[in-house]
Each structure stands twice: as C-alpha cells, then as structure tokens.
Design a protein with these regions (language model features):
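Hydrophobic positions on the alpha1 helix immediately C-terminal to the Walker A/P-loop
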Residues: 150, 154
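Switch/coupling sub-region of P-loop NTPases
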Residues: 155-265, 278
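Conserved lysine of the Walker
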Residues: 147
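Walker A (P-loop) phosphate-binding loop of P-loop NTPases
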Residues: 144
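P-loop NTP-binding catalytic core
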Residues: 32-133
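Hydrophobic anchor at the beta1->P-loop junction of P-loop NTPases
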Residues: 139-141
Length: 293
C-alpha cells in the first residue's frame, strides 16, 4: 500500500479528489467517469501514450511490480483506491485502467435513504434492529450495485465493544475509520494467506463479528462454519435475485456430496439477505435501492 500523489496520477487526480466520483475507467481510447450525481459519462480528454506509460510505471514502482507481456496484470491499493491495469498485449483495444474509490466514510444516512426511497423506513428500522440482535447478513447484487456501501451503513450499529474482524483482498470497508474507537482487526488476504486461512485464523482472535468483503468461492464453507460457532457476520455476494441465494452459496461450497445438509446449514445460519440494485434514469442519474429483502 502506498500514498497517492498528484504527480503519480496526473490528469486522473482531479477525479480522485472529487468526492462524488466513484470510478475512473480508461479503455485504451476513452476516459469514462462514474459520478454519484452525474451518472456515468465520457470525459473529453485525450490521454497520450506517454502519460499512460508514465502512470503505469509510477504505479508499478510504488508496489514493486511490473506491467509487461510477461506480467499482464498490475494491481495496487492505496488506503482509498483500488487500481487495476491490464497490459495491451491481452487488452487488444489498448491498455485498460480501472481506478475504484472506496473512501473512509459511510455514504448512506438514514434520512437520505428514506428521502431517496432506498428502502421504506419500516424496513430500514427492522434491519437496524436485526444488526443489534446479532443476525448474520448477506448483501447481494451485481458489480457496482453498492453492496459494500450498504454493508458499511449497517456496520455502524454494531456495539463498539464487540470485536470485529474484517477480511478483504482490497481494503474497502475501513471499519476502524468509520467506527472510531471500536475493537476491530483488519486482515488482508494475498499470496500465502487465503480467505480460508484468514477465516480459520480469526477463530483464535476472539471475534464477535466476522466480515468477509466478498464470498467468491469455497471460503464460504469456512464462513458458515464460523457462523455456526456463534460468531456473527456480514458478507457480500454477486447475485441478481435473492431467491437464488441458497443455490448460489451451495454452488460455491467445497462439499457437494451432502447437498441436503449444506442447504440446511445455509438456511440456518444466513439470517438476513438483501439484494441491492442500481438503475440509471433518463437523465443519466444513478439510483440505488434495496430491491429484495
């Protein structure tokens, strides 16, 4: 992890500093910006080959990495940025750059969620109370729907004395920053330390809550095992319909021989499922809401 500077990011910097910008995407030809207020739009800026080369070189140096025909993918994290670059030897349309912002704040507030019709006030209060009585949550949605932001909102209702362990490959939750004074441990997985390793190690750290940034594969088995011991938690998952959640989790589990037992475990330990969706209106504005609970 490194500290970003205007010199490193060049023309990207103005968008990084803009608090309403969430994503900066370059497809090899055009620069696309995703803004909370304006929606997604193309910026009329021409990025020279020289700038792109300098930018990728700066990022590679910051993480002691390389971007070339051998190392085709470059990934880097700062405290609030997740950067992904794909080399033009495989991105035939030109080098591809994605910068996603994950600020150390909770974007959603109760008043704004009600005003923007994110969900009915009655449902919102019910879900807040579900957190307070230690229920397990799974937040579903498609990429960019706002699953993590929704999870971060509900995390603020966890008691500060409850030890929370977050497990992420890219640090997006920022639990200690959004809940100052809370008992929290933040784990980052990577080479030699998998999600499953982190989940199993967490059991010896006296957690009350275990937060998995995203359930993608067989680590969901270990997560459910942890929840079965009385540890509570949140996770997010790619999903387009909440009714598919049990099958989606079951397909990721590494034990398919006893399907009935696995299905029973899912229904037993997943207390609350929330599907978050986003849509773009005719003016290009992005709107998010809880579509299913």
């Amino acid at each position: 992890m490194f500290e970003p500077t205007p010199k490193q990011f060049g023309v990207f910097w103005e968008f990084i500093e803009n608090p309403t910008v969430t994503d900066i995407d370059y497809n090899g030809r055009e620069l696309w910006i995703t803004d909370l207020k304006k929606g997604k739009y193309k910026k009329n800026i021409t990025l020279s080959d020289s700038f792109i080369s300098t930018f990728t070189h700066n990022i590679a140096n910051s993480v002691n990495g390389n971007l070339n025909k051998v190392n085709k993918i470059l990934e880097a994290d700062t405290k609030e940025l997740r950067i992904s670059v794909i080399h033009d030897s495989v991105a035939t349309s030109g080098i591809s750059i994605c910068i996603r912002k994950s600020p150390c704040l909770i974007r959603n507030t109760i008043d704004e969620m009600i005003k923007e019709k994110y969900c009915p006030e009655m449902i919102l209060q019910l879900l807040i109370n579900c957190v307070r009585v230690n229920m397990n949550f799974v937040f579903g949605g498609e990429p960019g729907a706002g699953k993590t932001e929704c999870a971060k909102f509900f995390m603020q209702f966890i008691r500060p004395e409850d030890r929370v362990i977050t497990i992420e490959d890219s640090l997006e939750i920022h639990y200690r920053e959004i809940n100052p004074g809370a008992d929290a441990v933040e784990l980052k997985v990577g080479d030699g330390f998998t999600y499953t390793d982190a989940i199993k190690a967490s059991l010896r750290q006296n957690p009350k809550w275990l937060m998995l940034s995203e359930a993608r594969s067989t680590e969901v088995t270990s997560l459910l095992e942890q929840w079965s011991t009385g540890v509570h938690g949140f996770t997010t998952i790619h999903l387009d319909d909440l009714r598919k959640l049990p099958d989606r989790i079951q397909n990721m589990m590494n034990n398919v021989n006893d399907a009935a037992r696995m299905e029973n475990r899912i229904y037993r330990y997943v207390d609350v499922g929330i599907l978050v969706k986003r849509h773009v209106d005719q003016n290009g504005q992005i709107h998010r809401k809880m579509d299913q609970v």
